[in-house]
Amino acid sequence: MQLDIKICGLKTEDAIAAALDGGASHVGFIFFPKSPRNVDIETAARLRHLASGRAQAVAVTVDADDEMLDRIVEGMRPDVLQLHGHERPVRVEALKKRYHLPVMKAVSVREASDLEVLPAYRGVADRFLLDAKPPAGAELPGGNGIPFDWSLLASLDGKVDYMLSGGLSAVNIGEALSIARPRGIDISSGVERAPGEKDPDLIRAFFSAVRAARGKRE
């Protein structure tokens, strides 16, 4: 089974080069001022150009209004919109119609009941990103470096297409793939030397760990 790999929160050419050389299927750019991974549209557009023909560019937003989304879509030309806020199904559907782009909806997970929202988004979201629910008081909806109980995902219908996110690293990716068996994975803080600072060596190490884990499974 093909495994999509998204490196998220990219801001520099050396980081995106490491992601693309490693075989990333998706590269993510975050438009959220509170995040240390926040990037301006001009930088994202330049980096996005480097990924053209090699990986899908994902614009990550958090409860963004239409004006901001218009600027991002026009300036960066993303392949996918990732909605990482509290966007309801009707909002997701409206944005799909407005921009004619695939939408990945992030859902925060701590316990089984958190997955009960998924049916409401099926048919409007093209894919889910299942991320660890942020700790109390956290300012960021994702990228907090904490995993959740992957065994919770065993109850999901096999037709649910999702990327697994939250606290992934070269150390635990083998276990995560074995337990959750996702069709895609997303990593951000697990390949950083400091918040918002991607480390090309850690990106390469992550891809090596993924290949090793998949080799064992096969």
From Swiss-Prot:
Q: EC number(s) in its UniProt entry?
A: 5.3.1.24
Signal peptide, first to last residue: none
What are the UniProt keywords, alphabetically? Amino-acid biosynthesis, Aromatic amino acid biosynthesis, Isomerase, Tryptophan biosynthesis
Superkingdom of origin organism: Bacteria
Query: Pathway it belongs to?
Result: Amino-acid biosynthesis; L-tryptophan biosynthesis; L-tryptophan from chorismate: step 3/5
EC category = isomerase
Per its record, what are the GO molecular function terms? phosphoribosylanthranilate isomerase activity
The UniProt catalytic activity note for this protein reads: N-(5-phospho-beta-D-ribosyl)anthranilate = 1-(2-carboxyphenylamino)-1-deoxy-D-ribulose 5-phosphate
Disulphide bridges: none
Q: Does the keyword rRNA-binding apply?
A: no
Pfam families, per this entry?
PRAI
The entry's family comment says:
Belongs to the TrpF family.
Q: PANTHER family annotated for this entry? A: N-(5'-PHOSPHORIBOSYL)ANTHRANILATE ISOMERASE (PTHR42894:SF1)
- Designated name of the protein: N-(5'-phosphoribosyl)anthranilate isomerase
Q: Which organism is it from?
A: Chelativorans sp. (strain BNC1)
Q: Which gene encodes it?
A: trpF
